[in-house]
Swiss-Prot record:
<dbReference type="GO" id="GO:0031397">
    <property type="term" value="P:negative regulation of protein ubiquitination"/>
</dbReference>
<dbReference type="InterPro" id="IPR032675">
    <property type="entry name" value="LRR_dom_sf"/>
</dbReference>
<dbReference type="GO" id="GO:0044782">
    <property type="term" value="P:cilium organization"/>
</dbReference>
<comment type="similarity">
    <text>Belongs to the CEP78 family.</text>
</comment>
<keyword id="KW-0966">Cell projection</keyword>
<feature type="compositionally biased region" description="Basic and acidic residues">
    <location>
        <begin position="721"/>
        <end position="732"/>
    </location>
</feature>
<dbReference type="GO" id="GO:0061512">
    <property type="term" value="P:protein localization to cilium"/>
</dbReference>
<dbReference type="GO" id="GO:0005813">
    <property type="term" value="C:centrosome"/>
</dbReference>
<keyword id="KW-0597">Phosphoprotein</keyword>
<feature type="modified residue" description="Phosphoserine">
    <location>
        <position position="330"/>
    </location>
</feature>
<comment type="function">
    <text>Centriole wall protein that localizes to mature centrioles and regulates centriole and cilia biogenesis. Involved in centrosome duplication: required for efficient PLK4 centrosomal localization and PLK4-induced overduplication of centrioles. Involved in cilium biogenesis and controls cilium length. Acts as a regulator of protein stability by preventing ubiquitination of centrosomal proteins, such as CCP110 and tektins. Associates with the EDVP complex, preventing ubiquitination and degradation of CCP110.</text>
</comment>
<feature type="region of interest" description="Disordered">
    <location>
        <begin position="325"/>
        <end position="345"/>
    </location>
</feature>
<keyword id="KW-0175">Coiled coil</keyword>
<protein>
    <recommendedName>
        <fullName>Centrosomal protein of 78 kDa</fullName>
    </recommendedName>
</protein>
<feature type="region of interest" description="Disordered">
    <location>
        <begin position="362"/>
        <end position="385"/>
    </location>
</feature>
<dbReference type="GO" id="GO:0005737">
    <property type="term" value="C:cytoplasm"/>
</dbReference>
<feature type="compositionally biased region" description="Basic and acidic residues">
    <location>
        <begin position="693"/>
        <end position="708"/>
    </location>
</feature>
Length: 790
């Protein structure tokens, strides 16, 4: 047991011895591909050459190793590359893959490899470089590898170049990178990363920057100067050949680089950057003075001037820095080398019956099998590897020399020529072949092709030169056209801006106008306005008919406003005849007209119609004006005085009593009188609610007319003559009770007239007769009551 423990310790210290021991246990031989670099103390091999059974001893040795400073495992297997093969049945071709799939491509082998690397990273204190190139690493493989990265105490460089881990795999790896205290450089070239992967790396930079600032603050206490180079964190990030990083990834790096003081190199070759991404990086360099390498070459979308400005700014930062971080060699096209394929030249030395000597100058390839004799040039071309004596195939040097002489006897003449050609850089092969017609034709054709080749090349060069000149000329024309087009576009944009401003101002004006016209465009609003004007002018017509034109003039209404709409005037409910209006105007102009003239006017009104009395609309009278109107009516009736009225009251009642008593026809029944009285009362009640304000002016204007027309019944008014009427009018009012009776009668008369105006014209005469009968009957009753009171 103790010997086994000692053996494991010794094997951990010596990789090669432990690997040989494990191979001997399974009856296998250590692979030459693995042993090749072990002499230098590193493990570097091509994983495609190992079979599945060869991986077990290697991984077991790697898991416990502690002395290897570098582990590099590579795979160049490309399954999409095949070989073109002709089918047996026809000319169709297809690609087949003749190479077997290596064992490292399997899930189990890759997982076991990552577990072995995790163990090596955990226990080794000298492993500084870990390179995995072209391996297929899955999620669980990366998770296992990340655990080893976080535990490593010596790893400085990590490379996963050409491993298609993608953004998800990089995110897993970043979990181990951000907590590593020794890792300084990472290489993710060709890992199928996008701008999201670049964002993951930018977050790692920000995280490490925060931790470094904390360490810097701690190291700066007591006036100490912190050493930034000795702090942990990444110093170089290589993301070449990830074309999907683009400007978004460059912007993410620019954001993190603006405050970073530790990153020294950032490689972004062939990452799909444009001038916008380069501009963002250039802005970050304005504040970052520690970045000495920012490689954005091989990005054709970046403007040449922008790339030059970025590189110039980076070189200014690197003047005072050391040369620890160098620019990565740009992946350029392979230069022609000695192994490149060259055109073969054939020189015919001569021909005879026995044969011809042919010299081919060019790349020495495998000689196809032929029936002709092929011999070497002699001593200069014959250099066999020396074999130890006793080995199979051993030939003494003297015997070999005699064989050379016998072979070179037929080529003595060509030896001098071959020595002359050997001075050149081209390999020379000299063969002697038997003459044949086909070979002679081939020789002639080849000689002709040697002469025609330079001519064809010169013709092609001239053609290409002409095309180049034509393209340059077209490019110049296109540039001129482009400048004109840009100028025209700028002019059109200016005109478009002006037209847009004009359109905006016009739209605002139209909008304001539409708001004002929107109300007037409505038919309902126009109709309501028209109706309001019609009602207003009708009201003005009523004022004019009522004789209140002066009131309208005082209110500021011009006489031209009357009859504005050209429609018939809206008079009172019953139109007054022209003669009646003239009679009323005469009464107002001549207040002291004789009683005979007044009686004739009243008689004329009774004959035509009782409903033709105009209704004044001066309803807004104050009590003072009402009293003045009453006084004026008394003056028109010729009232002499209060004493004379009281003295002649009894005589007036005696004179008028018999006619009033006899004025009622004897043939009327009691029922007919009740109906008439009820009708008169109902009409008076209806009219009192509508025309109460207009009662007093009408009653005061015509007190005598109401008295005389109501005092005489319709039957007796025709029988009486003009003389009786005059005597009746000329008698004075002698008592106060008669005044009350007259005022009550005037009010009833106004009520009857207002009730007539509400009803229609066909029933006008009928209502007037009933009102006259009712009013006569009431007058008789009130006269009798006043007589009893006196």
């Amino acid at each position: 047991m103790i010997d086994s423990v000692k053996l494991r310790r010794d094997c951990a210290a010596d990789f090669f011895s432990h690997y040989e021991y494990l191979c001997a246990l399974q009856d296998s031989v250590p692979l030459p591909a693995v042993r090749a670099c072990l002499r230098d103390g590193v493990l570097d091999f091509n994983a495609d050459r190992l079979r599945a059974v060869d991986w077990a001893p290697l991984l077991s040795t790697l898991r416990v190793n502690r002395d290897l400073p570098l582990v590099a495992i590579k795979s160049s297997f490309q399954p999409w590359l095949g070989e073109t093969v002709l089918r047996s049945g026809g000319a169709d071709t297809h690609r087949i893959c003749r190479n077997r799939v290596p064992a490292v491509r399997s899930k189990d082998i890759s997982f076991q490899l990552c577990k072995a690397l995790r163990g090596c990273l955990s226990v080794s204190g000298v492993l500084r470089n870990l390179e995995l190139n072209g391996l297929i690493l899955r999620e669980r493989d990366l998770t296992s590898l990340t655990k080893g990265l976080s535990k490593s105490t010596s790893l400085v460089h990590l490379s996963l170049a050409n491993c298609p881990i993608g953004d998800g795999g990089l995110e897993i790896i970043c979990q181990g990178i951000k907590n590593s205290v020794t890792l300084k450089t990472v290489n993710f070239t060709g890992c199928n990363l996008t701008w999201q992967g670049a964002c993951h790396m930018a977050k790692i930079l920000k995280y490490q920057t925060m931790r470094r600032h904390e360490e810097t603050w701690a190291e700066s206490l007591r006036y100490r100067r912190p050493d930034l180079d000795c702090m942990a964190g990444l110093r170089r990030i290589t993301l070449n050949c990830n074309t999907l990083i683009g400007d978004q990834g460059a912007s993410a790096f620019a954001d993190s680089l603006s405050e970073d003081l530790w990153l020294r190199a950032l490689d972004l070759q062939q990452c799909g950057l444009t001038s916008e991404g380069a501009k963002a990086l250039l802005e970050a360099l304005e504040t970052n003075r520690t970045l000495v390498v920012l490689d954005i070459r091989k990005n054709p979308l970046i403007d040449h001037s922008m790339m030059k400005a970025v590189i110039k700014k980076v070189l200014q930062n690197g003047r005072s820095a050391d040369s620890e971080y160098q620019w990565v060699t740009s992946p350029s096209s392979k230069e022609p080398s000695k192994t490149a394929k060259q055109r073969k030249k054939t020189i015919v030395l001569g021909s005879s019956r026995k044969g011809k000597a042919t010299i081919r100058i060019g790349l020495a390839t495998k000689k196809p099998s032929s029936n002709g004799r092929k011999q070497g040039l002699g001593k200069d071309c014959y250099a066999p590897n020396p074999l130890p004596p006793g080995a199979s195939g051993f030939l003494p040097w003297r015997t070999a020399e005699r064989a050379k002489r016998s072979r070179s006897s037929s080529l003595i003449k060509t030896r001098d020529l071959s020595n002359h050609l050997k001075k050149s850089d081209f390999p020379v092969t000299v063969t002697v072949e038997s003459p044949s017609s086909s070979e002679t034709d081939e020789t002639e054709d080849s000689s002709e092709s040697v002469q025609e080749a330079p001519q064809k090349t010169s013709i092609k060069e001239e053609t290409l030169q002409e095309k180049l000149e034509e393209c340059l000329r077209q490019l110049k024309e296109e540039r001129v056209i482009r400048l004109k087009a840009d100028k025209r576009v700028s002019e059109l944009e200016h005109e478009n801006a002006q037209l847009r401003n004009i359109n905006f101002s016009l739209s605002e004006a139209l909008h304001a106008q539409s708001l004002t016209n929107m109300i007037l465009d409505d038919e309902g609003v126009l109709g309501s306005i028209e109706n309001s004007f019609q009602k207003f002018h009708a009201f003005l017509d009523l004022l004019k008919d009522a004789g209140l034109g002066q009131l309208a003039t005082m209110a500021g209404i011009d006489q031209s406003d009357f009859h504005l709409l050209g429609r018939p005037q809206m008079n009172s409910t019953v139109n007054t005849p022209i003669q009646e209006q003239k009679a009323l105007e005469d009464e107002t102009l001549h207040p002291k007209q004789t009683a005979t003239g007044q009686m004739q006017d009243i008689r004329f009104q009774k004959i035509t119609s009782d409903a033709l009395i105009p209704l004044p609309l001066n309803t807004v009278q104050d009590p003072a004006s009402a009293q003045e109107a009453v006084g004026a009516s008394r003056d028109h009736l010729g009232v002499v005085g209060l004493e004379q009225q009281e003295g002649s009251a009894a005589g007036f009642i005696a004179k008028t009593g018999s006619p009033l008593a006899g004025g009622i026809p004897g043939g009327r029944s009691q029922r007919e009188e009740e109906v008439l009285s009820k009708h008169s009362r109902s009409s008076s009640e209806k009219g009192s609610t509508a025309s109460e304000p207009s009662r007093r002016p009408s009653a005061e204007r015509h007190p005598r007319k109401d008295l005389l027309s109501d005092a005489d019944p319709p039957g007796n008014s025709e029988s009486k003559g003009p003389g009786d009427r005059r005597s009746l009018l000329n008698e004075p009012i002698k008592s106060e009770s008669l005044k009350k009776c007259i005022s009550i009668k005037k009010e009833n008369r106004i009520v009857t007239v207002s009730s007539k105006t509400i009803k229609s014209k066909p029933n006008l005469l009928e209502h007037s007769e009933s009102d006259t009968l009712g009013s006569d009957f009431e007058l008789q009753e009130r006269v009798h009551s006043s007589a009893h009171l006196t």
